[in-house]
Amino acid sequence: MEITAVQSSYYGDMAFKTPPPDLESLLLKERIVYLGMPLFSSDEVKQQVGIDVTQLIIAQLLYLQFDDPDKPIYFYINSTGTSWYTGDAVGFETEAFAICDTLNYIKPPVHTICIGQAMGTAAMILSSGTKGYRASLPHATIVLNQNRTGAQGQATDIQIRAKEVISNKQTMLEILSLNTGQTQEKLAKDMDRTFYLTPAQAKEYGLIDRVLESPAELPKPMAVI
């Protein structure tokens, strides 16, 4: 007599119910990546949150390329990036640069879709999706700004940090200029103060390509050659 193991349903009698997989795994199965919190850099905060957000996002993107390099990836963004709502830094811009580089490195087309908000470096990540595949839901808010940092310590440490801030700002301007078609001078001027954009304004600015009302409006995958 052959005995076959059968996994019970996720729902049923409490005594026999098996725990469902975590939500991230369910989304990943459908090739969906979700950034729904800031990009923290502090190890202490990462331990409190229980996750290294940047590491998880990059690992998911790399896995999806390995899984199928031709199928599109859907990257939903609802994040304040490397800062709080106030603009105070909670992470280094290098966290966001790593995600942008990964988006450009992998082969699958990546739909970046803003839901809720994309602020600062999160807006930069939004703009780094595959051209023609960058979108926002109609009532989201997209914000361009710079992190406010308060360097502490010895004078030499403050000088080193100041150089890093200037270098990161320049890198962010270069990425945004490449993604939007705006000049670095215009971007620097607009980002001197918090710069709010509606999805329609973000489309005109070059941060996204379309405003979505439903999933049916997502662009169709490109033919594999």
Swiss-Prot record:
* GO CC annotation: endopeptidase Clp complex
Which GO molecular function entries does the Swiss-Prot or TrEMBL record give?
ATP-dependent peptidase activity; ATPase binding; serine-type endopeptidase activity
Do you know which InterPro entries this protein is assigned to? Answer: ClpP (IPR001907), ClpP/crotonase-like_dom_sf (IPR029045), ClpP/TepA (IPR023562)
Q: Which GO terms describe its biological process?
A: protein quality control for misfolded or incompletely synthesized proteins
Give the family this protein belongs to, as stated in its UniProt record: Belongs to the peptidase S14 family.
Q: Which PANTHER family match?
A: ATP-DEPENDENT CLP PROTEASE PROTEOLYTIC SUBUNIT (PTHR10381), ATP-DEPENDENT CLP PROTEASE PROTEOLYTIC SUBUNIT-LIKE-RELATED (PTHR10381:SF72)
Role description: Has lost the two conserved residues (Ser and His) proposed to be part of the active site. Therefore it could be inactive.
- What protein does this entry describe? Putative ATP-dependent Clp protease proteolytic subunit-like
